[in-house]
């Protein structure tokens, strides 16, 4: 049993704000939160280990709810191309983009992919992240999608972090199905998806519904199969063009629709009606030098929960810093500090279907982060620094500096 004292706790349990408790005490027992409240209300725990928070800020452990963490290769050359004027879409149409990463990832061994992914995951953890969603989508066939998802599962075996896996086989058309997207969709729904689901490798299913990806009709076939397998769905939607993907996802009760720069009010309303979370990805917006912002005001108006994630990937968001995304979301998308912190805690948990994480509440997992700052707004305000002091995974404390969670 642990007793964390002398802290301000941002519980994230109210509707819009931080749910802040000044001079709080949190009691952890058997990996879960047994008590959270004002210090003067806390029960006696004479045998507990007492941890002095030194007046710091305690938040839920951060949740990165959209990453592509398992890949090989580099896309630095495409970064240079874009600086010379090429667009993300032009590069993709010339065989670059996702397809170049597919080639490198297929050629890499599972051991090589695990080594790369461990380093990326540890970087996120060192900044306060306790849950990471990891997508496939750089294999695009049964063998290599399995390889990616297996590596994602191995991250959770070698590190204390909570991993949620998402099958993103419908990410791009692989070379063996060139000019035959419909044929590849059939391969996904007849073989890849049911096989990997039956192997227990899939927590959710995603697709890239876009002019350079898959059509709404093709995407819907994937959704129907996922629903038949009782798997939750997510969607890359409305990043480059409006394909009405967000509405389609919402109609299938998707956990989330992600990117959303081109989202319209019809899609927002559908998301609100079906409880679909809007996952905003300011790192991709920044890196691609986009100018069309997601409709944050419409999302607010209709009460759609907004989450924030890194979209960590080699092509459009080579970023492994979730706290930086708070600052970018505030600066680029005009989100408030409260919205930003909610976006990487309670709303990010909703985007993954996690109902016992993302808040500091009795009965929930003790995934917690202690920061040296006193004001919760500082986590959004400052960037380029790391105020994390201690991280708890299921009630086990880890000091950031010593990083005793390291698998290597």
From Swiss-Prot:
What are the entry keywords?
Answer: Cytoplasm, Histidine metabolism, Hydrolase, Iron, Metal-binding, Zinc
Q: Which amino acid positions bind Fe(3+), per UniProt?
A: 66, 68, 236, 311
User: What SUPFAM superfamilies does the database record attribute to this sequence?
Assistant: Composite domain of metallo-dependent hydrolases (SSF51338), Metallo-dependent hydrolases (SSF51556)
Instruction: Name its co-factor(s).
Output: Zn(2+); Fe(3+)
Q: Which Gene3D superfamilies match?
A: Metal-dependent hydrolases, Urease, subunit C, domain 1
Q: Entry's CDD domains? A: Imidazolone-5PH
User: Its Enzyme Commission number?
Assistant: 3.5.2.7
Q: Does the keyword Cytoplasm apply?
A: yes
Q: Which GO terms describe its molecular function?
A: imidazolonepropionase activity; iron ion binding; zinc ion binding
Q: Name one Pfam family in it.
A: Amidohydro_1
Principal subcellular localization: cytoplasm
Q: For binding N-formimidoyl-L-glutamate, which residues are annotated in this chain's numbering?
A: 138, 313, 315
Q: Name one GO cellular component term.
A: cytoplasm
Cofactor comment:
Binds 1 zinc or iron ion per subunit.
Transmembrane residue ranges: none
Top EC class for this record: hydrolase
The protein's annotated catalytic reaction(s) are: 4-imidazolone-5-propanoate + H2O = N-formimidoyl-L-glutamate
Entry binding sites for 4-imidazolone-5-propanoate: 75, 138, 171, 239, 316
Q: Localized where?
A: Cytoplasm
Positions binding Zn(2+) in this chain are: 66, 68, 236, 311
Q: Pathway it acts in? A: Amino-acid degradation; L-histidine degradation into L-glutamate; N-formimidoyl-L-glutamate from L-histidine: step 3/3
Q: Which HAMAP family match?
A: HutI (MF_00372)
Concerning its family, UniProt says:
Belongs to the metallo-dependent hydrolases superfamily. HutI family.
So what does this one do?
A: Catalyzes the hydrolytic cleavage of the carbon-nitrogen bond in imidazolone-5-propanoate to yield N-formimidoyl-L-glutamate. It is the third step in the universal histidine degradation pathway.
Name the chain's protein.
Answer: Imidazolonepropionase
Encoding gene per record = hutI
């Amino acid at each position: 049993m642990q007793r964390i004292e002398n802290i301000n706790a941002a519980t994230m349990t109210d509707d819009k704000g931080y749910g802040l408790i000044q001079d709080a005490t949190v009691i952890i027992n058997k990996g879960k939160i047994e008590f959270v409240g004002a210090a003067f209300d806390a029960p006696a725990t004479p045998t507990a280990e007492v941890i002095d928070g030194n007046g710091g800020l305690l938040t839920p452990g951060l949740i990165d709810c959209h990453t592509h963490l398992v890949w090989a290769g580099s896309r630095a050359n495409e970064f240079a191309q874009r600086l010379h004027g090429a667009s993300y879409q032009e590069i993709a149409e010339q065989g670059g983009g996702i397809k170049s990463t597919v080639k490198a990832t297929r050629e890499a061994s599972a051991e090589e992919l695990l080594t790369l992914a461990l380093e990326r995951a540890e970087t996120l953890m060192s900044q306060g992240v306790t849950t990471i969603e990891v997508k496939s989508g750089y294999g695009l066939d049964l063998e290599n999608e399995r390889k990616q998802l297996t590596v994602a599962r191995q991250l959770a075996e070698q590190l204390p972090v909570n991993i949620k896996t998402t099958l993103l086989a419908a990410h791009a058309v692989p070379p063996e199905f060139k000019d035959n997207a419909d044929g590849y969709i059939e391969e996904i729904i007849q073989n890849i998806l049911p096989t990997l689901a039956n192997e227990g490798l899939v927590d959710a299913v995603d697709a890239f519904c876009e002019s350079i990806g898959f059509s709404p009709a093709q995407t819907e076939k994937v959704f129907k199969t996922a629903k038949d397998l009782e798997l939750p769905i997510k969607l890359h939607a409305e990043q480059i063009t409006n394909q009405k993907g967000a509405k389609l996802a919402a109609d299938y009760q998707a956990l989330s629709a992600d990117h959303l720069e081109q989202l319209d009010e019809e899609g927002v309303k559908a998301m609100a009606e079906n409880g679909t979370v809007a996952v905003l990805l300011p790192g991709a917006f920044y890196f691609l030098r986009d100018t069309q912002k997601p409709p944050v005001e419409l999302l607010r108006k209709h009460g759609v929960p907004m989450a924030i994630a890194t979209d960590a990937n080699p092509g459009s968001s080579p970023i492994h810093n979730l706290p930086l995304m708070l600052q970018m979301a505030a600066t680029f998308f005009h989100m408030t500090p409260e919205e930003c912190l909610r976006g990487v805690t309670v709303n990010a948990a909703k985007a993954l279907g996690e109902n016992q994480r993302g808040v500091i509440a009795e009965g929930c997992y003790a995934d917690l982060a202690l920061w040296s700052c006193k004001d919760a707004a500082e986590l959004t305000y400052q960037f380029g620094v790391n105020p994390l002091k201690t991280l708890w995974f299921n009630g086990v404390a880890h000091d950031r500096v010593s990083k005793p969670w390291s698998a290597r």
